[in-house]
From Swiss-Prot:
Organism of origin: Caenorhabditis elegans
Annotated protein name in UniProt: Matrix metalloproteinase-C
Any one biological process term the GO annotation gives: proteolysis
Key words of the record: Extracellular matrix, Glycoprotein, Hydrolase, Metal-binding, Metalloprotease, Protease, Repeat, Secreted, Signal, Zinc, Zymogen
Motif Cysteine switch boundaries: 120-127
Pfam families the record matches: Peptidase_M10
CC cofactor: Zn(2+)
PANTHER family to which the protein is assigned, alphabetical: MATRIX METALLOPROTEINASE, MATRIX METALLOPROTEINASE-C
Record comment: activity regulation: Inhibited by human TIMP1 and TIMP2 and the broad MMP inhibitors BB94 (Batimastat) and CT543.
Glycosylation (residues): N231
Binding site for Zn(2+) 2: C122, H254, H258, H264
Length: 579
């Protein structure tokens, strides 16, 4: 069933090419109608395909998920009647790609955008894979996996191919409990690796030299294919530096990540970024394609951390220098649903943000229990410019709470409180700091990767970025947006979990993992199933350190241990910030 799902999400419709082509000229403009921007990284260069045509750029956006198959950009009667709506979708698709690729978000198919599209890349869609309620992350249900190489490269020896695959899986093995071993072709293996060209007996034909280099499917289907029309090499720095060949090892690490359940990363330095990264420096020296922190956080969020032991060579086929671990491991306890998705079992799983605050609990504690948690006491009279404030500059309640890169922000009624450490440093109108923001704010969320501050109110989301010149937050273009209909509840709290997942919470027992880039829900479930013993009414959390988070309800603060699922120290909000 999962294989069918992956196939469905990767396949796109091109039957409306004629209508779509009529839009292309509106977004190209011959170079004068749109701003220009430069490519973000020379390490992604590929001299064989300098740019894409307008028609291929259109197809690219469909192929890699920026225009969903359900949105055909054609009116109901089959005529190109709703041109304005189609233009909006197309421009949004271009901007999504530009943001994902790290280039200027012009909304036009400018030269920089088409040049980025021309880079060699993975064939897997950039759109996130949605998880249905009650399902687990795309992952293997066991830790010992086998792979077989069913066909071979026309450029490399079998030993070099074996070494590359063994090293690739060895890197993933070093940071997870997973173990990999090669078995002979034709065996019953978990992952089947092939080299093929053009139509090669799967739903996704290759495109010849350049463009798509390889593709793979999510667990537990185990499909892993390289395009044999590429010129492959194994760590040959001269060929790689001169753009004569593509490093098989780098591509194998990336595709191997897909076979383990990883999607594409928006971090352009990560192995799981969709674009091929040359493995040489400016002097032509080979640079080993190691996993980056983003890759490690993502894979450990699914499987947990490994033992840290060095990997050993494969026992099959005589590979030397490989990375697949074949040594025996102690039996481990099956992880909970919570651990499978949120990676709670290890203290060394860290947020990708820097923890700014060392929790400073006040000497005088105000412990609460039972029905007092998240009850919203003291929340009457919200909405006026002065409501929600008590003596000493402290709010009597909070509607939303979030950390950011420099400060934390507590929202109460029509006011926002800037907090440094455990001190309120400024109180001002929400509209002064966030022009055109809703009041009250029901939830707030800071995304350290994009630098966006998300505000939620009713069924809408507002995205802001901080202007260093104006010293206020300014709304991103394209916002506010209506939250996806499948969210199914009113947002009353939001938090960024230890491994980077962005979580929206209801006032009851529902939560959803949310991606604002695609405005999409990727997981829904019950809070009590994933966060046992977490009090109701959580508004936000401080940047977590290890497995312990500091969480805020409307008028309370408490510690929650994500590993033991237990409540620690507790305090009233006004006591916590020493007002």
């Amino acid at each position: 069933m999962r294989l069918i799902y992956v196939i469905a999400i990767l396949l796109v419709s091109t039957c409306q090419a004629g209508f779509f082509s009529s839009l292309v000229s509106r977004f190209t403009g011959g170079g004068n109608s749109s701003p220009s921007s430069s490519s973000s990284s020379s390490s992604f260069s590929n001299s064989r395909k300098p740019s894409l045509s307008d028609e291929k750029a259109r197809s690219y956006l469909q192929t890699f998920g920026y225009v969903p198959p359900s949105n055909s950009l054609q009116s109901r009667n089959g005529m190109a009647g709703d041109i304005q709506s189609a233009e909006q979708v197309f421009k949004s698709a271009i901007r999504k790609f530009q943001e994902f690729a790290g280039i200027a978000k012009t909304g036009f198919l400018d030269a920089a955008t088409k040049a980025k599209m021309a880079l060699s890349r993975c064939g897997v869609t950039d759109a996130p894979l949605a998880l249905t309620s009650g399902s687990s992350q795309f992952k293997w249900s066991k830790t010992r996996l086998t792979y077989s190489i069913e066909s071979w490269s026309s450029d490399l020896s079998k030993d070099d191919v074996r070494r590359a695959i063994s090293e690739a899986y060895g890197l993933w093995s070093k940071v997870t409990p997973l173990e990999f071993s090669e078995v002979p072709a034709g065996s019953t293996s978990d992952i089947k690796i092939r080299f093929g060209v053009r139509n090669h007996n799967d739903p996704w034909p290759f495109d010849g030299e350049g463009g798509v280099l390889a593709h793979a499917t999510m667990p537990e289907s185990g499909m892993f294919h390289f395009d044999d029309d590429e010129n492959w090499t194994y760590k040959d720095a001269r060929k790689i530096h001169n753009n004569e060949a593509t490093d098989l090892l780098a591509v194998a690490i990336h595709e191997g990540g897909h076979t383990l359940g990883l999607e594409h990363s928006r971090d352009e330095n990560a192995i799981m970024a969709p674009f091929y990264q040359k493995t040489t420096d400016s002097s032509g020296n080979y640079v080993y394609p190691n996993l980056k922190s983003d890759d490690i956080s993502a894979i450990q969020a699914i499987y947990g951390a490994g033992s840290g032991r060095s990997s050993s060579g494969s026992d099959f086929g005589g590979s030397s220098g490989g990375g697949s671990r074949t040594t025996a491991r102690p039996t481990t306890t099956t992880r909970s649903w919570f651990g499978r998705f949120f990676g709670d079992d290890d203290d060394d799983v860290r947020s990708r943000t820097t923890t700014r605050r060392t929790t400073l609990w006040p000497t005088t504690q105000s412990p609460f229990s039972g029905d007092d948690w998240g009850s919203g006491s003291g929340s009457s009279g919200r909405g006026g410019s002065s409501s929600g404030s008590s003596g000493g500059g402290c709010p009597s309640h909070i509607d939303a709470y979030t950390p950011s890169s420099s400060f934390s922000y507590a929202f109460s009624g029509s006011q926002v409180y800037t907090i440094s450490g455990t001190k309120v440093t400024k109180v001002q109108s929400i509209h002064d700091l966030f022009p055109s923001a809703p009041t009250p704010v029901n939830a707030a969320l800071w995304n350290p990767i994009s630098g966006s501050m998300l505000l939620f109110s009713s069924n809408r989301v507002y995205s802001y970025y901080f202007s260093n010149i104006r010293q206020i937050f300014q709304m991103d273009s394209g916002f506010p947006k209506t939250l996806p209909s499948d969210l199914g509840f009113s947002v009353s709290g939001a938090l960024r979990w230890i491994n980077g997942h962005q979580i929206l919470m209801s006032s009851g027992d529902e939560f959803a993992v949310y991606d604002e880039f695609w405005n999409q829900v990727t997981l829904k479930n019950r809070i009590s199933s994933y966060f046992p013993n977490l009090p109701r009414g959580v508004k936000g959390v401080e940047s977590p350190a290890g497995s312990v988070i500091t969480a805020f309800t409307s008028n309370q603060v408490f510690e929650y241990n994500s590993r033991t699922k237990s409540i620690g120290r507790q305090s009233g909000f006004s006591s916590y910030i020493a007002c």
